[in-house]
Amino acid sequence: VIIPAHAVELADGVFSLGAARDVEGSLVEGLMFIDYKKGNAKPPWAGGGGGTTTTTCFAFLANGAKWKNLETWIVNPANVEGLSDAFVFSNIAADIQKWEDASSTNILGNGNINTSVLVADESSPDGVNEVYFGNVDSAGAIAVTIVWGIFSGPPSQRKLVEWDQVYDQTDYNWSSSGEANKMDFEN
């Protein structure tokens, strides 16, 4: 995944991909979120926690923008680290379930394993919510999430229509058990 030349940086690690038509013909906007590696963390009792009290997280993409229908998703769990298909799938499904439990809403539908080559949609959505391991061509990027939706206009008309997520297996090693010097896919 490469930050497209047409992308406009809105904030650190947040890029507008512009407008495009979704598979139903609606005009939607794309956003790319890059999750950069941060320094090693130290718990407060060990002398850490001295950072700022502000956050750079986003609470909402846009007031009213949410999934209007259950969204199925697919994952191609193939990876160079040897993480099993079952582990990758069940971990993503469990993370989605935590998100749904926290919101008390069934947001995403069922997931499926897919062995086809998946492509993050940087120019326009293809109607498929995709997760896979690949190359994220941005220094220090652990993963990229691309979200397509309607983020402006009357809040009741706003919605999310697609998301794609890519974990960088070119620059980072991944682990299922929290091994030192590897990214913990469990978290």
Language model segments and positions:
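Disordered inhibitory propeptide/activation segment of secreted metzincin zinc metalloprotease zymogens
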Residues: 1-85, 141-160
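Metzincin-family zinc-dependent endopeptidase catalytic domain
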Residues: 88-187
